[in-house]
Amino acid sequence: MKYDHIIIGAGSAGSILATRLSEDPNKSVLLLEAGPDYPEIDTLPEEVKYGYATGTEITTSEHNWQFTARGTDDAEILVPRGKVTGGSSAINGQIFLRGIPQDYDNWAEMGNDEWSYQQLVPYFNKVETDTTYQDDPGDFHGADGPIICHRFPRDTWLPATHAFEKAILDAGYPYCEDANAPGSTGVGPLPLNNPNGIRWSTAIGYLGLSRHRLNLTIRPDVSVKRILFDTTGNHPEATGVEVVSGEETFVIEGSEIILSAGAIASPQILMLSGIGNSSHLSEHGIPTIKHLEGVGQNLADHPMLYVTWITKPEVDLDAMKPRIQITLRYTAEGSDLENDMIVYCVAATGDRPERG
């Protein structure tokens, strides 16, 4: 069988693409995922269903690729990537915070106006059901999208959360009611996509809407070795994928091949397929299909620093309570990048809680 669309990776992007493309009943869609699939919320493993992406239960999980990188010459750092339907949205910290408008506008200035903040706002809204603003979503919130977003009301805040807010306000920072509004800065409730404590991944939000469709085939536990190309013309054309399922290798044909395997695996698959720096490919015995020096280069990620205090004995640090409820966004002194700093108050420690 030749599929109309083959999607490599059922993660944050792939699950959405599969759902949207399969809306056309005349198109066949194959969604490939290297990790397992859990069709029902009740069947999700605990570390996928709950958690904050920081405990050993997720960093050592079989649902995490457990990639490492060298932050310095002397130390390795973890690079968590999801290996399950939902991808990294199934193992993340559920912080549903939009990017800075300036960043999107900078992308637009590079040549594509469609990436400006104003152009993207309708798509931000389309993704979400923001329960805080569901009755009056206005211009900057969604009321009927697949991903559920909420904020903890003030009367549910923990003592440490109240203390954090007071300290920030006393330091002169403003209060921010809505951190997802354009131009927002200061301290206030943090938008989260974990209603009732459940990590609301794209596997739940999007594949939950589409997995019943007869024109959508979801194949978990299938690893893609490479994309296949027809090189007889002037420009290489992707025609299929070579995959491993069980211990067998298969070739699957498709009219369109969509690579959405994440920030690490997507360039890896491209290079294994012959797309990348030709000198680097030749070192590994891979024939070059297309020389592109940037593939697998220039990855940037945000650093994080933990500062820990021991609280007074009378302070409630019940591990079953929510950990992160509010946040501070601000601009570092001397920086020309708006809101380039963010601070969370992690209000509890202990075993992974099932928390709302």
Name each model feature, range by range.
Residues 1-356:
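N-terminal redox-cofactor-binding region of secreted/periplasmic oxidoreductases
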